From Swiss-Prot:
<dbReference type="InterPro" id="IPR005824">
    <property type="entry name" value="KOW"/>
</dbReference>
<dbReference type="InterPro" id="IPR005756">
    <property type="entry name" value="Ribosomal_uL24_euk/arc"/>
</dbReference>
<feature type="compositionally biased region" description="Basic and acidic residues">
    <location>
        <begin position="121"/>
        <end position="138"/>
    </location>
</feature>
<dbReference type="GO" id="GO:0003729">
    <property type="term" value="F:mRNA binding"/>
</dbReference>
<feature type="compositionally biased region" description="Basic residues">
    <location>
        <begin position="9"/>
        <end position="18"/>
    </location>
</feature>
<dbReference type="InterPro" id="IPR041988">
    <property type="entry name" value="Ribosomal_uL24_KOW"/>
</dbReference>
<feature type="region of interest" description="Disordered">
    <location>
        <begin position="1"/>
        <end position="26"/>
    </location>
</feature>
<dbReference type="GO" id="GO:0005829">
    <property type="term" value="C:cytosol"/>
</dbReference>
<feature type="region of interest" description="Disordered">
    <location>
        <begin position="121"/>
        <end position="146"/>
    </location>
</feature>
<dbReference type="InterPro" id="IPR008991">
    <property type="entry name" value="Translation_prot_SH3-like_sf"/>
</dbReference>
<dbReference type="InterPro" id="IPR014722">
    <property type="entry name" value="Rib_uL2_dom2"/>
</dbReference>
<comment type="similarity">
    <text>Belongs to the universal ribosomal protein uL24 family.</text>
</comment>
<dbReference type="Pfam" id="PF16906">
    <property type="entry name" value="Ribosomal_L26"/>
</dbReference>
<keyword id="KW-0689">Ribosomal protein</keyword>
<dbReference type="GO" id="GO:0006412">
    <property type="term" value="P:translation"/>
</dbReference>
<dbReference type="GO" id="GO:0005634">
    <property type="term" value="C:nucleus"/>
</dbReference>
<protein>
    <recommendedName>
        <fullName>Large ribosomal subunit protein uL24z</fullName>
    </recommendedName>
</protein>
Amino acid sequence: MKYNPRVTSSRRKNRKAHFTASSSERRVIMSSPLSTDLRQKYNVRSMPIRKDDEVQIVRGTYKGREGKVVQVYRRKWVIHIERITREKVNGTTVNVGIQPSKVVITKLRLDKDRKSLLERKAKGRAAADKEKGTKFTSEDVMQNVD
């Protein structure tokens, strides 16, 4: 159900917004979830992916493979990961494009801007959890299973 009357649910308009998005908008759209370890450490679910992050592929042909992000190709909505390549007919090797939603970030490349973003997102999430008051940890759930 739509809660905000100013947000469209038109398929045509959403597709147009997606495919004509600027590079800065694509950065946010091309976010990847964090691994469970990082999620518990930072209290943040996902982050915009960037070069030099270490990721693990969780869907598709290359499932289970890990590597460092070599390039974020925003125009094609894909990322290139080291050692994920294929050989062309003429013998040259090229990177295979992987969608950012099909990977989990296992190690973040942190600088001051990224640290401030993590703190800001964690602060907002903590405020929402406090307001809601129904946040369960994985330990709470496992205690109830037995």
